[in-house]
Amino acid sequence: MSKTKKIIIAIVSILLCALIVIAVICKSNQNVQKIIKDDFGSSMSVILDNPSDFGLSDIDASSDIEILNEININNLSNDKGNVISIPVVINGNIELIYSISLTACSYNVSVGKDYAPLLNEMKKNGYNEVYIIQDEYTFYAFSDNHIYKQSGQEITQIDEKDLDFTIQDDMKKSDLISVNDDYTQASIESLKTANNE
């Protein structure tokens, strides 16, 4: 084997190893629990400082905050994206959605009302396992033949005949009552850190 081929093989081997290391680092940087611990507190501090700006009342740093499991969004446009949506329960009500947008080796977080009022309406009416369907900027929640629609911040109950789609076999349900203890603990630690800064 010529010296040039050996050098090329060595360079390719080094590059492959570097790519594997980068992929492992990127994967480990996208651990949801770590992201919550690192960023939830600073995101929530803005809301807790000015709750009325976000359409919230009667919440502050002493409020009881719990984090539910991730929501399965069934997107009609088939644009699955790489966004993790996590409901935030404050004093027993689903008030906010904590969203994590994953990119190649990074992430962005946001927290806001989004479709939290729709989830809270379903939970309030006793529908704890629901299909969440997104059609562009409109969200639908289905459970036991009960359908609610959220467009903007307005929520209405609708009939199945008013829909342009049906539940498909590959659509997934979301659980609106299961608290994720690990996420909740990470959020509490993150809030404590943010309040001490």
What function would you assign to each model-found segment?
Residues 7-10, 52, 109:
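Generic detector of intrinsically disordered, low-complexity, polar/charged segments
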Residues 28-76, 113-128:
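Short, non-transmembrane alpha-helical segments in secretory-pathway proteins
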Residues 95-140, 145-194:
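A short, surface-exposed interaction/processing loop segment used at functional sites
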Residues 12, 21-24, 32-35, 46, ...:
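Extended aliphatic helical segments
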Residues 1-41, 197:
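Gram-positive cell-envelope targeting signals
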Residues 56-103, 144:
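Exposed beta-strand-loop-beta-strand "reactive/processing" segments of non-cytosolic proteins
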